């Protein structure tokens, strides 16, 4: 009886042979379903396709819309401008690019990508902004005669570029699809 307690204690010490290692902190893994695109049509001078993950919300001005992505807490703000002449077009494009340049305070880089779809008369630039910028993507598209659409992608979360990267890449694909399917009426 007098040896039972020491023997049990010894057995407990010997039985604990598990190696303890520090486990890495888990990272959030953001995965989104493959998008299914549906047509957008209105009384405005354009049509395009957008993801079924987005909801269309009207803004206060006609032909201004918000594509709201509730799952990602993201929005694409679309603004349409009728163009009166070449100077008006140049001024609107300059305003769009000025808006991008104002983000250089927080952006670690700005990568412009021009696109040209002659068959549909869609021309423009997509800007990807890296770092802690308020916007992550900005674009404008025009037919260079009568129509211009400007768009910006915002996330309703603090700008933590690395954490948002999967969502930003998803939104970039959606914006590119919107641009590729954009048609003027």
Describe each model-derived feature in a short phrase.
Residues 1-4:
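Positively charged n-region of N-terminal signal peptides that target proteins for export
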Residues 12-15:
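C-terminal motif of bacterial Sec signal peptides marking the signal peptidase cleavage site
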Residues 24-44:
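Post-signal peptide N-terminal segment of mature Sec-exported envelope proteins
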Residues 33-38, 63, 119-128:
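Short, hydrophobic/aromatic-rich segments at coil-to-beta transitions
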């Amino acid at each position: 009886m007098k040896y039972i307690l020491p023997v049990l204690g010894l057995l407990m010490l010997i039985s604990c042979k598990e190696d303890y290692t520090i486990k890495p902190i888990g990272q959030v893994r953001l995965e989104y379903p493959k998008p299914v695109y549906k047509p957008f049509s209105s009384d405005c001078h354009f049509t395009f396709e957008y993801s079924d993950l987005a909801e269309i919300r009207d803004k206060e001005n006609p032909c201004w819309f918000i594509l709201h992505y509730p799952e990602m807490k993201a929005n694409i703000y679309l603004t349409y401008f009728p163009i009166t002449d070449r100077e008006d077009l140049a001024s609107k494009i300059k305003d769009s690019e000025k808006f991008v340049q104002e983000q250089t305070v927080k952006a670690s880089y700005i990568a412009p990508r021009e696109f040209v779809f002659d068959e549909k008369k869609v021309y423009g630039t997509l800007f990807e902004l890296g770092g802690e910028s308020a916007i992550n993507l900005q674009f404008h598209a025009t037919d260079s005669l009568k129509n211009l659409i400007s768009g910006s992608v915002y996330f309703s979360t603090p700008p933590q570029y690395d954490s948002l990267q999967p969502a930003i890449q998803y939104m970039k694909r959606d914006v590119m699809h919107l641009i590729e399917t954009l048609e003027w009426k």
